[in-house]
Amino acid sequence: MDEREQTELEAAVFRRLVDHLRRRTDVQNIDLMITAGFCRNCLGDWYRDAAAERGIEIGKEEARARVYGMPQGEWKKRYQKEATPEQQKAFEEAQKTHS
């Protein structure tokens, strides 16, 4: 496999992950953060970082919308639930191990 093919495969995997997260609106960002140490916001921020590394300017909201499939605020209104005290505690504990 050459570098171009590897990049194409990695891009396809990223698109599949984003599509999966768009369909799984039942999975809350806080639960992703607790379990995996990243969430939809992180993916949007990493997208923006990758663009900046290549001299491409993209705003935070635009980058996150590319992950959410809509403006983040709209997604939050439609799908985000209030975090439970248990989730908040688990999030705080997880922050100690995730970087």
Residue ranges: model-predicted function:
Residues 1-99:
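Domain-level signature for proteins that mediate thiol-based redox and metal-cofactor handling
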